[in-house]
């Protein structure tokens, strides 16, 4: 088995890259791919860059070049559900674009043509992540994660996302693009992210301050998943 892992930013993949043995590094376009062994498991680790297009380019390269059997998306997210705090873990049941709208042609909000209304995460991976979070005594929630090419800082954008997707737990900028690529390639995926901010008016300051904590928390979760796959 080969495990694929995707993070957008250097801080979100560095801990795992540092643990990798027999490491081979490939730079393609704006993406960096690390291949090697982590705790005796074959891993392909991608730093994709930020945003949906970068994530889709990177995920496609990862799946074509490295042929992983599954993909875990790691990193940080803005927590918008009640009860989520900085450092808590969110696990995707499903993902959707909050900035896609083809409803004029009868599609659901967030749905693109030829795609499902929402991209479903692999249930076995979801359950494994949830089990590990509980074992690590992490605060964890599973549910809907919404993606778009905007850093959400409260106000009208956040209100609109909540109106369109009342069950949304967290917002970020890559997960659904990765999910769409995995769906196209029929590769199981799950999103495991740690909360860095609350998507409100203080989000940018909170993100800068708490990104290292979120990256550490999500990477620790993924490392434990590697050990249990």
Curated annotation (Swiss-Prot):
The active site is at residues 12, 197. Its EC number is 3.2.2.9. One of its GO terms (cellular component) is cytosol. Pathway: Amino-acid biosynthesis; L-methionine biosynthesis via salvage pathway; S-methyl-5-thio-alpha-D-ribose 1-phosphate from S-methyl-5'-thioadenosine (hydrolase route): step 1/2. It catalyses: S-adenosyl-L-homocysteine + H2O = S-(5-deoxy-D-ribos-5-yl)-L-homocysteine + adenine; S-methyl-5'-thioadenosine + H2O = 5-(methylsulfanyl)-D-ribose + adenine; 5'-deoxyadenosine + H2O = 5-deoxy-D-ribose + adenine. InterPro entries: MTA_SAH_Nsdase, Nucleoside_phosphorylase_d, Nucleoside_phosphorylase_sf. Keywords: Amino-acid biosynthesis, Hydrolase, Methionine biosynthesis. It comes from the Bacteria. Substrate binds at residues 78, 152, 173-174. It holds the Pfam family PNP_UDP_1. One of its GO terms (molecular function) is methylthioadenosine nucleosidase activity. Signal peptide: none annotated. GO terms for biological process: L-methionine salvage from methylthioadenosine; L-methionine salvage from S-adenosylmethionine; nucleoside catabolic process. Gene3D superfamilies: Nucleoside phosphorylase domain (3.40.50.1580). Catalyzes the irreversible cleavage of the glycosidic bond in both 5'-methylthioadenosine (MTA) and S-adenosylhomocysteine (SAH/AdoHcy) to adenine and the corresponding thioribose, 5'-methylthioribose and S-ribosylhomocysteine, respectively. Also cleaves 5'-deoxyadenosine, a toxic by-product of radical S-adenosylmethionine (SAM) enzymes, into 5-deoxyribose and adenine. Belongs to the PNP/UDP phosphorylase family. MtnN subfamily. NCBIfam families: MTA_SAH-Nsdase (TIGR01704), PRK05584.1 (NF004079). This is 5'-methylthioadenosine/S-adenosylhomocysteine nucleosidase.
């Amino acid at each position: 088995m080969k495990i694929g892992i995707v993070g957008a930013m250097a801080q979100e993949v560095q801990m795992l890259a540092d643990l990798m043995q027999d490491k081979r590094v490939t730079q393609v376009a704006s993406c960096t791919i690390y291949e090697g062994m982590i705790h005796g498991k074959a891993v392909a680790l991608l730093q994709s860059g930020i945003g949906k297009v970068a994530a889709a380019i990177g995920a496609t390269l990862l799946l074509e070049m490295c042929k992983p059997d599954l993909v875990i998306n790691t990193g940080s997210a803005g927590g918008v559900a009640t009860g989520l705090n900085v450092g808590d873990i969110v696990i995707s049941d499903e993902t959707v674009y909050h900035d896609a709208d083809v409803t004029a042609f009868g599609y659901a909000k967030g749905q693109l043509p030829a795609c499902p209304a929402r991209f479903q995460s692999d249930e076995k991976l979801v359950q494994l992540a949830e089990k590990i979070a509980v074992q690590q005594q992490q605060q964890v929630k599973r549910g809907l994660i919404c993606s778009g090419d905007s850093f959400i800082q409260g106000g009208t954008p956040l209100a609109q996302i909540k109106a369109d997707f009342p069950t949304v737990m967290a917002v970020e900028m890559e997960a659904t693009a990765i999910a769409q690529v995995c769906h196209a390639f029929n590769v199981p995926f799950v999103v495991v992210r740690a909360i860095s901010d609350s998507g409100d008016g203080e989000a940018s300051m909170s993100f800068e301050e708490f990104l290292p904590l979120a990256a550490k928390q999500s990477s620790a979760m993924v490392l434990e998943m590697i050990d249990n796959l």
